[in-house]
A protein has these predicted regions:
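Charged, amphipathic alpha-helical coiled-coil/dimerization segments
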Residues: 13-15, 92-150
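Residues at secondary-structure transition points
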Residues: 22, 26, 53, 71-74, ...
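Pre-recognition alpha-helix immediately N-terminal to the DNA-recognition helix
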Residues: 30, 37, 57-61, 122
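N-terminal helix-turn-helix DNA-binding core of bacterial DNA-binding proteins
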Residues: 40-83
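Short, hydrophobic-biased segments on the C-terminal half of alpha helices
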Residues: 73, 91-92
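N-terminal leader segment of winged-helix/HTH proteins
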Residues: 1-49, 97-99, 152-155
Length: 155
């Protein structure tokens, strides 16, 4: 077997030569693979609870992004990395599913607080427990991978 060597490539942006370290690329690829596996797990878990992955993320953002039991549309837009109007639509759809409710602020009635409903809290509790366990498994795999070279799964 021929040992894998580092390669040099020229950066288009700077024109400088950049050394590609194969071990670093393997670690980045392994991290990306594990991240995608976690995201696929999350999507399946959400759908099993009859919510969309985005609705699960919304519930998580309301409950976990701030120290309050509610969040504003702007805070949720930042948490979800979405546009304000996209989050408004997501909140409206979640309201139809009885996952969240909106409360207008006082004295500024334009200020909207988004709260979880009892149903939203129950869905979030079940999904959060599953995700917490999966994060533990992911951390174990990542730690093991940092100590050894990742093996191909043959897929």
């Amino acid at each position: 077997m021929v040992p894998i060597q580092s390669k040099k490539i020229r950066s288009r942006a700077s024109g400088n030569s950049v050394k590609l370290d194969h071990k670093m690329l393997q670690q980045l690829a392994w991290f990306r693979y594990q991240l995608r596996r976690f995201l696929r797990f999350s999507e399946k878990a959400a759908r099993a609870e009859r919510v969309t992955p985005q609705q699960y993320q919304l519930l998580l953002g309301i409950s976990g992004y701030t120290s309050r039991p509610w969040a504003t549309i702007g805070e949720l837009a930042e948490f979800l990395q979405e546009r304000h109007n996209a989050v408004v639509g997501l909140v409206e759809r979640a309201m139809k599913r009885r996952l969240v409710r909106k409360v207008q602020g006082t004295p500024d009635r334009r200020f909207i607080r988004v709260h979880l409903t009892a149903r939203g809290e129950a869905v979030l509790a079940r999904l959060a427990e599953q995700h917490h366990q999966e994060v533990g498994h992911l951390a174990s795999r990542m730690l093991a991978a940092s100590r050894t070279r990742p093996k191909s799964s043959g897929r």
